[in-house]
Every structure is written in structure tokens, then in C-alpha cells.
């Protein structure tokens, strides 16, 4: 079996990962451009960890400016088998107040300015996104949260908006009445690209606010978010430490096939594939392209 390598993408408020033993910076070049930041490698409880701050240190990148393809590509090149996204979000549910960690199981993509696939002209592929989150990772995350006494909600739909502005009241009410659970700005196309790269993916959506739908709460502001972010970031780091301690040391096959998503996805005939695009796909799709 393959050794498990746990990737952590840190969202707003999580720009480093204390507790990494043997921590060192690693710069990996990507044919898809510059990732958000150099990777931080190390171990926690003996488990290989690769950390990437999504917005760079100091929160230099807005959600629309992040090079999601380069981020996923360098994580794949670093050997990551399982990827956890730590992401701030707003809540549409009374039962998911600020401070709650939501283990979402579905996404709705409302972004419109981002490159959302590694594939395209010269090599077309269609991966399934019916079940975008690894149920195995959600089970491990739930167990880790319970062990740390962290309030979690199991399941929910994350709607990803383009940003960087927050929602209008009409938008917020539309999302709430649609039955969505939380709203954020970063998990799409990240989850789609992780699937194309055959990396098992799960999100911990960390609630900071009620967006602007709630009659008893003011419209969300950056100041409000920062106040909750500090507490959420501390809990997230404790969650990662516990997860790493109990995580299997060998990569477990994904029950929904995330780690073999390209087996039936490629549609372009081999003789019609663009050699230049294939070079860029060496890490993401090398398993099937070389086979």
C-alpha cells in the first residue's frame, strides 16, 4: 500500500502549522504557475504532513487571485494522498452558530472568474463530482473533533461565491431558502481540482458569522470575522494534531473512488492529445497517461 501523506490547506487565519516536527520549506515548481506560497513539510506524531497557506502569509491573496491549479499540482507533486481544507465560512443555519466546525459533504459552485480544470483542448476529461468529499476523511475528522471536544456538524452544503465582496441580503436569503448550510469563497474550484488530481479531499468549514440573513445579527464585517477566527484557528490546529496522531499510516483506498477518479474520465483519443498539455499533466494525470 501507499504511504499516507496528509496535506493541509490553511484558510483565513491559518498561515502556519505549529507542532510540525522537522519543519522545512520546500519550493516546488508547477507548470500551472505560482502556488500561493512555498510548502511547509514535516511530521506530526510521525505522519508526513504538507502544509500550504491558501492566502499566503499575511493574507496577501484574495479568493479570486489564488492559483488553485498550481496549489493542487504542487501538493500532488509533494506526494499528498489525502487533503484537508480548513476554511472560514458564514452560516445559514441557527444550529450552526459561530465557532461550529461543519464537515460538509456537498458543494454548489457559484464562482465565475477561476480556472476550474486541468483538462481542456487537447486532452478532455470529465470526472464525477456527485460525491465531492471523501467519507473516509470525514469519519477521521469527526473522531478527531470529538476527541478534542470541538463542536461539529456532520454534513451540509457549502455554496462557494466569487467574492471578494460579502453577500447582498437578497443573495443571502436565496442561499438560505435553497437549503444551503454555509457560504465561503475558496472551496471551489479547489475540490474539483483535487478530484481531477485523484487526491482524497475533505473540508472543515469553520463558522465565523451568520452572513447577513439573520435578523438578530448585524451584517458580516471583517472585524467580526477576525474576532472569531482566532478561536477557530486554535481549535483547527488542535484538530489537525489529533487527526495526525490517529490517522492511518498507509493510504486507505477511497470508498467513492476519489483516488482513481481518472480511470473512466479521459475521453480524448490518445492520438489526438496535445503533447504540450500532456507535459503539464505529468503529476496530476501521470498514472493514467503513462498506463
From Swiss-Prot:
One of its GO terms (cellular component) is cytosol. It is an enzyme of class 2 (transferase). Pathway: Amino-acid biosynthesis; L-methionine biosynthesis via salvage pathway; S-methyl-5-thio-alpha-D-ribose 1-phosphate from S-methyl-5'-thioadenosine (phosphorylase route): step 1/1. Gene3D superfamilies: Nucleoside phosphorylase domain (3.40.50.1580). InterPro entries: MTAP, Nucleoside_phosphorylase_d, Nucleoside_phosphorylase_sf. The record marks 167, 222 as: Important for substrate specificity. Phosphate binds at residues 12, 54-55, 87-88, 186. It comes from the Bacteria. GO terms for biological process: L-methionine salvage from methylthioadenosine; purine ribonucleoside salvage. It holds the Pfam family PNP_UDP_1. Its EC number is 2.4.2.28. One of its GO terms (molecular function) is S-methyl-5-thioadenosine phosphorylase activity. CDD domains: MTAP_SsMTAPII_like_MTIP (cd09010). Keywords: Glycosyltransferase, Purine salvage, Transferase. Substrate binds at residues 185, 209-211. Catalyzes the reversible phosphorylation of S-methyl-5'-thioadenosine (MTA) to adenine and 5-methylthioribose-1-phosphate. Involved in the breakdown of MTA, a major by-product of polyamine biosynthesis. Responsible for the first step in the methionine salvage pathway after MTA has been generated from S-adenosylmethionine. Has broad substrate specificity with 6-aminopurine nucleosides as preferred substrates. This is S-methyl-5'-thioadenosine phosphorylase. It comes from Bradyrhizobium diazoefficiens (strain JCM 10833 / BCRC 13528 / IAM 13628 / NBRC 14792 / USDA 110). The gene is mtnP.
Amino acid at each position: 500500500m501507499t504511504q499516507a501523506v496528509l496535506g493541509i490547506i490553511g484558510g483565513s487565519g491559518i498561515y502556519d502549522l505549529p507542532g510540525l516536527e522537522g519543519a522545512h520549506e520546500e519550493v516546488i515548481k508547477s507548470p500551472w504557475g505560482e502556488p500561493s506560497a512555498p510548502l511547509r513539510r514535516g511530521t506530526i506524531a510521525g505522519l508526513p504532513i504538507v502544509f500550504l497557506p491558501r492566502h499566503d502569509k499575511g493574507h496577501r491573496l484574495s479568493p479570486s487571485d489564488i492559483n488553485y491549479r498550481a496549489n493542487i499540482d504542487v501538493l500532488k507533486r509533494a506526494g499528498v494522498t489525502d487533503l484537508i481544507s480548513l476554511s472560514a465560512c458564514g452560516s445559514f443555519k441557527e444550529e450552526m452558530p459561530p465557532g461550529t466546525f461543519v464537515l460538509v459533504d456537498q458543494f454548489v459552485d457559484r464562482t465565475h472568474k477561476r480556472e476550474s480544470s486541468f483538462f481542456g483542448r487537447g486532452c478532455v476529461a470529465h470526472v464525477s463530482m456527485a460525491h465531492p468529499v471523501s467519507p473516509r476523511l470525514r469519519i477521521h475528522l469527526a473522531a478527531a473533533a470529538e476527541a478534542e471536544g470541538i463542536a461539529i456538524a456532520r454534513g451540509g452544503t457549502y455554496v462557494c461565491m466569487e467574492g471578494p465582496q460579502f453577500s447582498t441580503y437578497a443573495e443571502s436569503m436565496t442561499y438560505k431558502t435553497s437549503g444551503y448550510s454555509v457560504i465561503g469563497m475558496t472551496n471551489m474550484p479547489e475540490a474539483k481540482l483535487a478530484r481531477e488530481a485523484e487526491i482524497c479531499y475533505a473540508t472543515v468549514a469553520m463558522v465565523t458569522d451568520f452572513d447577513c440573513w439573520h435578523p438578530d445579527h448585524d451584517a458580516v464585517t471583517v472585524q467580526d470575522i477576525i474576532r472569531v477566527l482566532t478561536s477557530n484557528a486554535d481549535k483547527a490546529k488542535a484538530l489537525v494534531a489529533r487527526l495526525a496522531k490517529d490517522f492511518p499510516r498507509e493510504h486507505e483506498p477511497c470508498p467513492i473512488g476519489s483516488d482513481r477518479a481518472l480511470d473512466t474520465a479521459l475521453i480524448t483519443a490518445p492520438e489526438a492529445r496535445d503533447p504540450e498539455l500532456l507535459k503539464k499533466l505529468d503529476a496530476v494525470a501521470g498514472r493514467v497517461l503513462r498506463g
